[in-house]
Amino acid sequence: MAIEIKGYIVRDSDQQIYDWFGIATTAPQNIRKAIAEANGAPLDVEISTCYGGDVFSGSEIYSALRGYSGGVHIRITGLAASAASVIAMAGPNEMSPTAQLMVHRVSSIAAGNYHAMDKSSNDLKEADKAIAAAYVAKSGMSEKDALKLMDAETWITAAHAVELGLVDKISDAATPQLINAAYGLPLPRAVIEKTRAMIAEGKAKSKEISKEYLDAGKPTAEQIQAKKDFAYAKLNLLEKSLFI
């Protein structure tokens, strides 16, 4: 059974929001569903162009694939960056000669006094070690060497990945479209939560208007305006999230 991992790695609860904006994502629930449908048959996982994303969601996907008893084979055909590079370590793998891996340190946003900053720093260091463990388990390199790669925000070619032991072999594949790597998720947390509330409000308002004018036989002015307002709000949120 084939699974494609692409776009951004996001939480299950956030995927609906990204879908709403038409942004490609992969969430743990997609992988769990595919594993259930495979029912013990081998999985052919293709990482096409995946920019990484949420650390914990990436860990869930990695663990689900690594623990699957039916067999997993992973092909990197475009870009496996950040959290996606961790997922690429979940089983026997191969990499297109034109593909790339990218590994780097975990990042986050924190606020507070110096105690909070110290805690945030320590948490990030522990998260880095957890991610490095995937590279260590795959390649046999030391944790120190794995963290050194992450320190430099390293871009790794297929040949170098094989040399490092991160990839088992180089495969033949079509040349992927050249892209610029994106850092961080394209939708800030505040935009996700605001959109979630707006969708819920829009659904409730739509039901209220539909019930009130059920016998009208055609859309009312209020219904048309409500749909326009909802569309404008969606476009405004998308503009702010992508261009700030």
Which residues are covered by each model-predicted region?
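N-terminal organellar transit peptides
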Residues: 1-83, 90-99, 107-244
